[in-house]
Amino acid sequence: IYSEDFVDRLAAGEWTFEIPSGKKIDNEVDAAVQLYNLYIVAPALGMDFSQYFTPEEANWFAMLLDAEDYVQKGPGFVGSDISHRNSRPLLDDFFASIDRQSAEHPDGSATLRFAHAETLIPFEALIKAPGSQTQITASDLDFWKATDWRGASQGRMAANVQWDVFANDQGQQVVRMLSLIHISE
């Protein structure tokens, strides 16, 4: 899909491109990452990009994007919560909604929220949901061996975090949380 001349000019620094998001493509690796981004959405587009990546290359790029999402949105590095502390207001609102719904609708109700992976991934890290519990150190160079976090599971389409609230006759409540991110289609 990329000509040899195109790749050589990128590698030599002769060409750079800016994509609509504002990111720059400065070299052949940046161009390959953009091609891989097409590869991972290609099935939804009805296209086959497998001719451009061997399974080993696809796994390497998957790990690269997983590591980026893990550090930027997920559990991140040991001793730091910067990647997911912004989810705290959402967690606080979950609890406030439970209190409000219980008071206003004691016989039952529901609060539904719909969000993208950019919201769900940090939230799962904050509550230490399965797959989002392990933080890594800067010396953990093999990301996939250091953690079980995988973007294909944690940030998947139709992921779900469900809280069911049950109350006994005395009004004591218990919350059951179901994290449905590892369901198979």
How should these model regions be labeled?
Residues 1-111, 115-184:
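Signature for phosphate-centric chemistry
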